[in-house]
Curated annotation (Swiss-Prot):
Multifunctional protein that plays two independent roles: viral suppressor of host RNAi (VSR) and viral inducer of host attractiveness to insect vectors (VIA). Acts as a suppressor of RNA-mediated gene silencing, also known as post-transcriptional gene silencing (PTGS), a mechanism of plant viral defense that limits the accumulation of viral RNAs. May directly interfere with mobile silencing signaling. Also inhibits signal transduction by the phytohormone jasmonate, making the infected plant more attractive to aphids, which are the second host to play a role as a dissemination vector. It is found in: Host nucleus. The keyword Transmembrane helix does not apply. Homotetramer. Interacts with host AGO1; this interaction blocks AGO1 cleavage activity to attenuate RNA silencing and thus counter host defense. Interacts with host JAZ. Keywords: Host nucleus, Host-virus interaction, Inhibition of host innate immune response by virus, Suppressor of RNA silencing, Viral immunoevasion. Residues 23-37 have a biased composition (Basic residues). It comes from the Viruses. Residues 16-45 are annotated as: Disordered. A motif (Nuclear localization signal) lies at residues 22-27. One of its GO terms (cellular component) is host cell nucleus. It comes from Cucumber mosaic virus (strain FNY) (CMV). This is Suppressor of silencing 2b. The keyword Magnesium does not apply.
């Protein structure tokens, strides 16, 4: 049983439409992921560089941000790198019992 030429072109047109619809779905899925905040590692590195470029108080080496994103375990690092990651005393020097410290609304509200 042979198909005529008209039926063959119809099948090819349907196949082309299906392929185009699949490409469109893939494209919109990628765009939706970006809008929801799901980024590839390279997109994440680019956005990190763009954000940190405008912070005058934070000197960033670009190699740190473009590298692979991984969690750092301080216990596994050498002593010199572990001490660099720890906060200084003035960064976290506060009274744990003073819950409303620095909250202007709570200080004058009652």
């Amino acid at each position: 049983m042979e198909l005529n030429v008209g039926a063959m072109t119809n099948v090819e047109l349907q196949l082309a439409r299906m392929v185009e619809a699949k490409k469109q779905r893939r494209r919109s899925h990628k765009q939706n992921r970006r809008e929801r905040g799901h980024k590839s590692p390279s997109e994440r590195a680019r956005s990190n560089l763009r954000l940190f470029r405008f912070l005058p108080f934070y000197q960033v080496d670009g190699s740190e941000l473009t590298g692979s994103c991984r969690h750092v375990n301080v216990a596994e690092l050498p002593e010199s790198e572990a001490s660099r990651l720890e906060l200084s005393a003035e960064d976290h020097d506060f009274d744990d019992t003073d819950w409303f410290a620095g909250n202007e609304w709570a200080e004058g509200a009652f």
